[in-house]
Amino acid sequence: MRALTIAGRGAAPAVADLPVSHLDAGQVRVAVEAASVNGIDVAAAAGYLWDRMPHEFPVVLGRDFAGTVDSVGSDVTRWKSGDRVAGVITAMALGSGAICEVVNADATVLVAVPAGLSALDAAAVGLAGVAATDLIAALGLTADDVVLVSGASGGVGAFAVQLAARAGAKVIATARGGDAARFVRDLGAAEVVDHTEGLAAQVRAAAPEGLTAVIHAAGDPAQLAALLISGGRLASVVGATPDQVGRADVTTTPVLAVATPDKLSGLLEAAASGALRVPVARTYRLDEAPQAISDFASPKLGKLVIAIR
């Protein structure tokens, strides 16, 4: 099979041919139709995770996937050949990934792709949608909250804007002007502030009584936390710590997205019904996947998705 790989320490991401691994009991072989790019893939490709996660070379990049069941291992009764499924690879080691033609997944982590939802959209939800869900839960957002979403036009941020608005909170989103501002407004942001031009003054104008919560998906956590009222909350998907936030009167929660079938299934159902918009910024072919890794850090409106077949 073809896969987006890192051959060894210091190697650049490249599409390579790999053997398909043996299908174990309890596993499902999925013919992958689409996968998406997340920050963990870019960090792995850049070598930032060498000392943080075990690496089993060649590392196949990618966490999110959607496709069709090809075959099932012994003891699997929930799935059959031809079923449309999606999943998130949750292993704490880097090795088996999702940006490839075939994934052998534990049957218990898969969810059904609802009728009417494309594989591209199902794959785009994945880890970013789960991270946004976990951020909202960490903050416990309600209609009484005024929340700033930083990095609102990226994958996690775009889902977080929608979920925060659905929770009833007033959402202030950071985005550059023009298309990015229109994009986050369409997702449910009540106000948009340009993080490149006097962020504090813009936020104070949009929320004169101060912010009660911050979703930190980008930017300086201390700068964002300074805009919170005393007793406010900051949830960070990029690992901000209380020391980095620098305020003892603010609750800081680092969020590590935990993908479960229940969370993913709920997100896919919401996407299929139209209650959740799946923001796909660009779609790449598998042979263009290394470029998607390179493009991840550039400004974009939503997720980067790889069409496998």
What are these regions (language model features)?
Residues 21-36, 49-91:
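Glycine-rich beta-strand-centered segment in the early N-terminal region that forms part
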Residues 70, 172, 235:
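Conserved beta-strand positions in the Rossmann-like core of class I SAM-dependent methyltransferases
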Residues 123-197:
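Mid-domain Rossmann-like dinucleotide-binding core that forms the NAD(H)/NADP(H) cofactor-binding site
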Residues 31, 78, 88-151:
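NAD(P)H dinucleotide-binding glycine-rich loop of Rossmann-like/cofactor-binding domains
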Residues 1, 264-309:
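C-terminal hydrophobic helical "lid"/dimerization subdomain
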Residues 218-279, 308-309:
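Glycine-rich phosphate-binding loop and adjacent beta-alpha segment
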Residues 198-209:
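Short amphipathic alpha-helix with an adjacent loop that forms part of the alpha/beta core around
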